[in-house]
Amino acid sequence: MAITAQQVKELREKTGAGMMDCKKALTETDGDMDKAIDLLREKGIAKAAKKADRIAAEGSTLIKTDGNKGVILEVNSETDFVAKNEGFKELLNTLADHLLANTPADVEEAMGQKMENGSTVEEYITSAVAKIGEKITLRRFTVLTKDDSSAFGAYLHMGGRIGVLTVLNGTTDEETAKDIAMHVAAVNPRYISRDQVSEEETNHERQILTQQALQEGKPENIVAKMVEGRLNKFFEEICLLDQAFVKNPDEKVKQVIAAKNATVQTFVRYEVGEGIEKRQENFAEEVMNQVKK
């Protein structure tokens, strides 16, 4: 019998499974909705879909480069234990290879792309969820490019808890590029240089520092000078080039870069779970939630 789009839509809403999985299940069960749900459950696909309301705030970052292209990605899981699972690591590598080869514009586009095995990225992740038993999400990625006279710097901290990918122009010294990536991982600057800081943000900080100085009872005639000094400290906290180099605090990052006749084109820093609010549950609630399932 012919399967209608409405049937597929209804099954997707009931199970959260992918469109092609739903269509296939309905075809195999002659359009019987209940049997199709059972079939999806038997295959572990509906089970995976039911995990969609959970918060995936663990996981790992990964960086891969190929010639003049590089990718950094973050994939989330629910527990740190799964993030160390070989199956999860294989998934990370497979996704990295796909993103590097196909350079989708964003996660939404990536999820709909076909992979070498014929499935979409979304279907591939769903099948991995069924095997691993936790919600897994491709949270974000960035593909960077460089030219032959530039260098990628890749650094993973704590096995991928933090990942940084940098591009240095004017040098092919990957060791220096990696050192800068390590610095970014440790210090977490927000900008490359102070000229990237908006006038609005600078003025806002200046206003706060001025009020701080006045509250301290400093004479007005020296407040302006104090504020500019403190503003320099502010820039050192947020701007990469102004920071003391983590491997040698006697040097500024800009001095390390200048010694190689290089400039920082860009950097991307991912920290697993940043910005995701992890649900806090007590043990009694956790037990009750398991009982209800």
Curated annotation (Swiss-Prot):
Residues 79-82 are annotated as: Involved in Mg(2+) ion dislocation from EF-Tu. The keyword Cytoplasm applies. It holds the Pfam family EF_TS. GO terms for biological process: translational elongation. One of its GO terms (molecular function) is translation elongation factor activity. Keywords: Cytoplasm, Elongation factor, Phosphoprotein, Protein biosynthesis. This is Elongation factor Ts. It comes from Bacillus subtilis (strain 168). The lineage of its organism: Bacteria, Bacillati, Bacillota, Bacilli, Bacillales. The gene is tsf.
